[in-house]
């Protein structure tokens, strides 16, 4: 098991309290006006996000359907078939590189597509917690600043701390993170293009148990190299280095068998390059493992569906928040009356929910209109339901 040492230093903290007068009606109205502008921007941005997402989703789905109808699987990956020149091919095989990747500073050498060195520094980290409360007619903001030491991969600028004295971090690391990538990667006789090499991202931690300490001032503990006098009790500024790799090339007695991938791309000589579809999209697919062509396209369609629904939800949320901010001024006008204020708040949120849902569905329908007119009309009909429900509830409330 890898050792993961940490400091036993005492947590430090201090509290600051800022006092300000309670904002008047005009001041709060001015703040709300600024929020209205932000809300308007979010509202308009949501239309762009939802509409373009539908175009992207349908374009991707069309390209995948086209690719599935055209893809062919060569008889062998150890020979280049001339009859497949320019065609979309389905290749399965183990990755192979031309040379070892290494970091001579730490004595690390292995056959892989990518080798990543990850460097962390022991630093002071500031966290703050704030709360506001009213006391004697004044608004008070209490902020609690806490300082603790942690291993972080990014430089934390202690000059931005509320209290830098006693919590100063170094301004740079003596050793930096980096990633080495094999220039040539093959599957059988075929060379992967740079776009496919970028997709090899199945990083695994590299065990350092069989490596020796590379230098006198570097200590190996578990799967880390420590630039520290005592890794068990590190000091601010100490470093620790770990390694990970992706795309193991060739069988290794310690790391296991070579990594197998499934690629769908265009054959250009002995290279696998992007394939352009009739819809204007490109197909350049790499999946980790052994999959049939049908399985690869099914996985891509599922991924496209999840991305589409995720962006739809993000667009709806942006629209809902935008409407909330734009109607916030109505809440400000009545916030002197507690009971009425709460009723208005509930009503405004219900209004924003209904309008955001309706406009989202209408925007989705508009995005589909050019591709699937019948589906667009159905969604447009569903979009009117929340509005009709809201309108029918208004007379009922008036009768009450």
UniProtKB/Swiss-Prot annotation:
<keyword id="KW-0007">Acetylation</keyword>
<dbReference type="GO" id="GO:0005637">
    <property type="term" value="C:nuclear inner membrane"/>
</dbReference>
<dbReference type="GO" id="GO:0006629">
    <property type="term" value="P:lipid metabolic process"/>
</dbReference>
<feature type="topological domain" description="Perinuclear space">
    <location>
        <begin position="367"/>
        <end position="368"/>
    </location>
</feature>
<dbReference type="GO" id="GO:0005788">
    <property type="term" value="C:endoplasmic reticulum lumen"/>
</dbReference>
<keyword id="KW-0812">Transmembrane</keyword>
<keyword id="KW-1067">Emery-Dreifuss muscular dystrophy</keyword>
<comment type="similarity">
    <text>Belongs to the TMEM43 family.</text>
</comment>
<comment type="function">
    <text>May have an important role in maintaining nuclear envelope structure by organizing protein complexes at the inner nuclear membrane. Required for retaining emerin at the inner nuclear membrane. Plays a role in the modulation of innate immune signaling through the cGAS-STING pathway by interacting with RNF26. In addition, functions as a critical signaling component in mediating NF-kappa-B activation by acting downstream of EGFR and upstream of CARD10.</text>
</comment>
<comment type="subunit">
    <text>Can form oligomers through the transmembrane domains. Interacts with EMD; the interaction retains EMD at the inner nuclear membrane. Interacts with LMNA and LMNB2. Interacts with SUN2. Interacts with RNF26; this interaction is important to modulate innate immune signaling through the cGAS-STING pathway. Interacts with CARD10. Interacts with gap junctions proteins GJB2/Cx26 and GJB4/Cx30.</text>
</comment>
<feature type="topological domain" description="Nuclear">
    <location>
        <begin position="2"/>
        <end position="31"/>
    </location>
</feature>
<feature type="transmembrane region" description="Helical">
    <location>
        <begin position="346"/>
        <end position="366"/>
    </location>
</feature>
<keyword id="KW-0225">Disease variant</keyword>
<feature type="transmembrane region" description="Helical">
    <location>
        <begin position="32"/>
        <end position="52"/>
    </location>
</feature>
<feature type="transmembrane region" description="Helical">
    <location>
        <begin position="314"/>
        <end position="334"/>
    </location>
</feature>
<dbReference type="GO" id="GO:0042802">
    <property type="term" value="F:identical protein binding"/>
</dbReference>
<dbReference type="GO" id="GO:0045087">
    <property type="term" value="P:innate immune response"/>
</dbReference>
<protein>
    <recommendedName>
        <fullName>Transmembrane protein 43</fullName>
    </recommendedName>
</protein>
<keyword id="KW-0391">Immunity</keyword>
<keyword id="KW-0209">Deafness</keyword>
<keyword id="KW-1003">Cell membrane</keyword>
<feature type="transmembrane region" description="Helical">
    <location>
        <begin position="369"/>
        <end position="389"/>
    </location>
</feature>
<keyword id="KW-1133">Transmembrane helix</keyword>
<dbReference type="Pfam" id="PF07787">
    <property type="entry name" value="TMEM43"/>
</dbReference>
<dbReference type="GO" id="GO:0005886">
    <property type="term" value="C:plasma membrane"/>
</dbReference>
<feature type="topological domain" description="Nuclear">
    <location>
        <begin position="335"/>
        <end position="345"/>
    </location>
</feature>
<feature type="topological domain" description="Perinuclear space">
    <location>
        <begin position="53"/>
        <end position="313"/>
    </location>
</feature>
<keyword id="KW-0122">Cardiomyopathy</keyword>
<keyword id="KW-0472">Membrane</keyword>
<feature type="topological domain" description="Nuclear">
    <location>
        <begin position="390"/>
        <end position="400"/>
    </location>
</feature>
<keyword id="KW-1010">Non-syndromic deafness</keyword>
<keyword id="KW-0256">Endoplasmic reticulum</keyword>
<dbReference type="GO" id="GO:0071763">
    <property type="term" value="P:nuclear membrane organization"/>
</dbReference>
<keyword id="KW-0622">Neuropathy</keyword>
<keyword id="KW-0399">Innate immunity</keyword>
<dbReference type="GO" id="GO:0005794">
    <property type="term" value="C:Golgi apparatus"/>
</dbReference>
<dbReference type="GO" id="GO:0005789">
    <property type="term" value="C:endoplasmic reticulum membrane"/>
</dbReference>
<keyword id="KW-0539">Nucleus</keyword>
<feature type="modified residue" description="N-acetylalanine">
    <location>
        <position position="2"/>
    </location>
</feature>
<dbReference type="InterPro" id="IPR012430">
    <property type="entry name" value="TMEM43_fam"/>
</dbReference>
């Amino acid at each position: 098991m890898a050792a993961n040492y940490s400091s036993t230093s005492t947590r430090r903290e201090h509290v600051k309290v800022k006092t300000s007068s309670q904002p008047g009606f005009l001041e709060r109205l001015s703040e709300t006006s600024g929020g209205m502008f932000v809300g308007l921007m979010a509202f308009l941005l949501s239309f762009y996000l939802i509409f373009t997402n539908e175009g992207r989703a349908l374009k991707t789905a069309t390209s995948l359907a086209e690719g599935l109808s055209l893809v062919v699987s060569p008889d062998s990956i150890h020979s280049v078939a001339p009859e497949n020149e320019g065609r979309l091919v389905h290749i399965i095989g183990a990755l192979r590189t031309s040379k070892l990747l290494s970091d001579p500073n730490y004595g690390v050498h292995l056959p892989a597509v990518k080798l990543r060195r990850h460097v962390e520094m022991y630093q002071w980290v500031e966290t703050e917690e704030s709360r506001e409360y009213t006391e004697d007619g004044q608004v008070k903001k209490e902020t609690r600043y806490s300082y603790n030491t942690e291993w972080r991969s990014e430089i934390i600028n202690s000059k931005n701390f509320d209290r830098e004295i006693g919590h100063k971090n170094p301004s740079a690391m003596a050793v930096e993170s980096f990633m080495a990538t094999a220039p040539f990667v093959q599957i059988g006789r075929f060379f992967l293009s740079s776009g496919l090499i970028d997709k090899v991202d199945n990083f695994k931690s590299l065990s350092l148990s069989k490596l020796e300490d590379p230098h006198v001032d570097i200590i190996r503990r578990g799967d880390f190299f420590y630039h520290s006098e005592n890794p068990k009790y590190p000091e601010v500024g100490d470093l620790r280095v770990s390694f990970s790799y992706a795309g193991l090339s060739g069988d290794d007695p310690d790391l296991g068998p070579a990594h197998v991938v499934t690629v769908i791309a265009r054959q250009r000589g002995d290279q696998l390059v992007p394939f352009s579809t009739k819809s204007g999209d490109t197909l350049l697919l790499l999946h980790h493992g052994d999959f049939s062509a049908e399985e690869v396209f099914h996985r891509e369609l599922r991924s496209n569906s999840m991305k589409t629904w995720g962006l739809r939800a993000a667009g709806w949320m942006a629209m809902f928040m935008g409407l909330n901010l734009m109607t916030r001024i109505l809440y400000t006008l009545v916030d002197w009356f507690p009971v009425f204020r709460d009723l208005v708040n509930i009503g405004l949120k219900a209004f924003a929910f209904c309008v955001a849902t309706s406009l989202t569905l209408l925007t989705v329908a508009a995005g589909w209109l050019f591709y699937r007119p019948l589906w667009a009309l159905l969604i447009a009909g569903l979009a009117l339901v929340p509005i009709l429900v809201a309108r029918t509830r208004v007379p009922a409330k008036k009768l009450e």
